[in-house]
A protein has these predicted regions:
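N-terminal membrane-anchoring/stem segments of glycan-assembly enzymes
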Residues: 1-43
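Membrane-embedded multi-pass helical conduit in multi-pass membrane proteins
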Residues: 4-5, 21, 43-44, 240, ...
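Cell-envelope/extracellular polymer assembly enzymes that use nucleotide-activated donors
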Residues: 47-50, 80, 218
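Short, acidic, metal-binding catalytic loop of nucleotide-sugar glycosyltransferases
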Residues: 67-78
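Conserved donor nucleotide-binding strand/loop of the catalytic core
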Residues: 80, 93-118, 164-169, 174, ...
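Short aromatic/hydrophobic "clamp" motif used to bind/position activated sugar donors
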Residues: 124
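Acidic donor-binding/catalytic loop of UDP-sugar-dependent glycosyltransferases
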Residues: 129-144
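Catalytic donor/gating beta->alpha subdomain of glycosyltransferases that bind UDP-sugars
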Residues: 145-176, 211-212, 220-285, 353-367
């Protein structure tokens, strides 16, 4: 093997093995490592909570959210609801629902800061207006707070299964994420809850920088920063419909990626490690490596493979790696065609969504670097 062949093989192997470590190696590690999480039940279940629903240009979607909220099983607890929105207050509204109308659009983070000023319960629950909670969601969330070490609880995010439209491959990603959250919580702590359903102890809330793009990740980090863990409540479910089409899903992915790069710039990995080494280990694989390394590793694997084709085109190693990469990207391309044609993908959803996700991450990085991602995100239309 020549020096050039060795170099290009090393580049290719770094890319492929790095991706394997990020997406499959980490779950295996946290599965095999001893649990740091030692749950206790030293406190009674909270009996009062506030549900905050931020909404902008939701229209009928907000009406449906209110119907869903009123149908929740809250007979055992006192639940206050704060709706902060641009829409006018309905003429008839239950007494436990507080309506805050915003005339100026300042972004979600600013809206949450304003709503938090009205909270007087020990627990606050954030839930996006485009999601529906299962009837027992709030009860399941509150039960996790019997452990005094828990500062926040992340619910389960899922997609409604009774719809035939939307980006079908989105579901396979959230199934993977749900499995990882279970492992994260078992090992130590969930690494960032989703804004669809996230609860915290009200006293631990730290006002958000108004220009925050990923408010849920910032809220989660502030909880960990104060020495608390984030639990996972898989039976508290927030369901939303899939994105209407690939363009809408790409818009959502790109803005999330832009927010991720903003968070990484403001919270360097070494600073996270100094506060919580165990959380930093999780954050390294769950967020940092995905955003900073994964797209680059995919490019490295392609560059190295191209070099191998140039210096050693007849090598069995080159033939094997090239065949594997060509097959993978061909399946991803086929998945794209089928997804665009709204044809059921089956297992083809995995290679397609993997490539699609990392392309969106690169676009999100470009948008953030060039300052083109506004805090005033446009609402994406769900199916």
């Amino acid at each position: 093997m020549t020096v050039a062949e060795t170099i290009y093989l090393g580049i290719t192997s770094t890319g492929i093995l790095g991706l394997f470590l990020i997406y499959l190696g980490y779950p295996l590690m946290v599965l095999l490592l001893p649990k740091r999480n030692r749950p206790s039940t030293g406190q009674p279940t909270p009996t009062a909570a506030t549900l905050i629903i931020p909404a902008w240009r939701e229209g009928k979607g907000l009406d449906q959210k209110l119907e869903n909220t009123l149908a929740l099983n809250t007979s055992e607890i006192e639940v206050q609801v704060i709706v902060i929105t641009d829409q006018s207050k309905p003429s008839e509204l239950p007494a436990h629902i507080q309506w805050i109308t915003e005339t100026e659009r300042l972004g979600k983070a600013a809206s949450l800061n304003r709503a938090m000023q009205q909270v007087n319960t020990p627990i606050v629950i954030f839930s996006d207006a485009n999601t529906h909670l299962n009837p027992a969601a709030i009860l399941q969330i509150l039960r996790s707070f019997t452990d005094p070490s828990i500062g926040a609880v992340a619910g389960e995010k899922g997609l409604m299964t009774d719809r035939d439209s939307g980006v079908r491959s989105e579901r396979i990603y959230w199934n993977y994420e749900s499995a990882l959250k279970k492992l994260d919580a078992r090992f130590n702590s969930v690494v960032g809850g989703a804004g669809e359903l996230l609860a915290i102890r009200s006293d631990y809330f730290v006002p958000l920088p108004p220009d925050s793009l990923l408010d849920d990740l910032v809220i989660s980090w502030e909880i960990v920063k104060q020495g608390h863990r984030i639990a996972y409540a898989p039976d508290a479910r927030a369901l939303e419909t899939p994105s209407r089409n690939l363009r809408e899903e790409a818009t959502r992915k790109i803005r999330i990626a832009a927010g991720g790069y903003q968070f990484l710039d403001r919270h360097p990995l070494y600073a996270i490690f100094a506060i919580s080494p165990s959380y930093a280990f999780q954050f390294l694989f769950r967020k940092w490596a995905r955003w900073r390394l994964a797209p680059v590793l995919m490019i490295l694997a392609l560059i190295g493979n191209t070099g191998l084709l140039y210096v050693a085109p007849t090598s069995h190693v080159t033939e094997f790696i090239t065949s594997a990469q060509v097959a993978f990207y061909a399946l991803a391309a086929l998945g794209f065609i089928l997804e665009a044609g709204r044809v059921k993908l089956g297992w083809l959803a995995a290679p397609f969504y993997f490539v699609f996700m990392h392309v969106c991450q690169l676009r999100g990085w470009l948008r953030y670097r060039f300052g083109n991602q506004s805090v005033l995100w446009e609402r994406t239309t769900r199916s």
